[in-house]
């Protein structure tokens, strides 16, 4: 199920992307061929271990988990791309997302967000998501200035 895009989707994806950036960086250190082999042979427990190991440096245990599967794109005329299903479970919210790892980039696409006690105000829900993710981190990160 794909999250119906709304005016809050992009902001929430950016919040999640910033939060899991260090995890994506750690996962990109693993060779794409290894991920592809693990996905092809459905070695999901091994992928879950890799995701857990990458996340344990930055988040409280159980916050970032491998989801139900993944996929890969591997064609002769392009660089490999690995897609991993992730479940993020900070306090009070569960985010189901796909992490896309490619050449020099990584991206996130949220499939669904479940707030345990949703507010009627979407802005409050977005602020709660950001706060909950920040509270679940071991290492507090600060925005880096963009190079000009």
From Swiss-Prot:
- What domain of life does the native source organism fall in? Bacteria
**Database matches in InterPro entries:** UCP034217
Q: Which family does it belong to?
A: To A.tumefaciens Atu0565/AGR_C_992.
What name does the UniProt record give this protein?
Uncharacterized protein R00649
The species this protein belongs to is Rhizobium meliloti (strain 1021)
């Amino acid at each position: 199920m794909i999250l119906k895009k709304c005016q809050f989707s992009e902001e929430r994806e950016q919040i999640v992307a910033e939060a899991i950036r260090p995890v994506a960086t750690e996962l990109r250190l693993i060779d794409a061929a290894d991920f592809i082999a693990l996905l092809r042979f459905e070695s999901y427990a091994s992928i879950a271990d890799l995701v857990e190991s990458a996340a344990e440096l930055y988040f409280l245990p159980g916050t970032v988990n491998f989801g139900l599967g993944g996929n890969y794109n591997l064609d002769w005329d392009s660089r490999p791309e690995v897609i991993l299903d992730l479940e993020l479970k900070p306090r009070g919210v569960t985010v189901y997302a796909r992490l896309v790892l490619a050449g020099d980039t990584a991206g996130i696409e949220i499939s669904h967000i479940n707030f345990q006690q949703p507010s009627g105000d979407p802005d409050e829900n977005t602020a709660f998501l950001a706060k909950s993710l920040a509270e679940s981190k071991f290492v507090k990160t600060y925005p880096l200035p963009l190079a000009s």
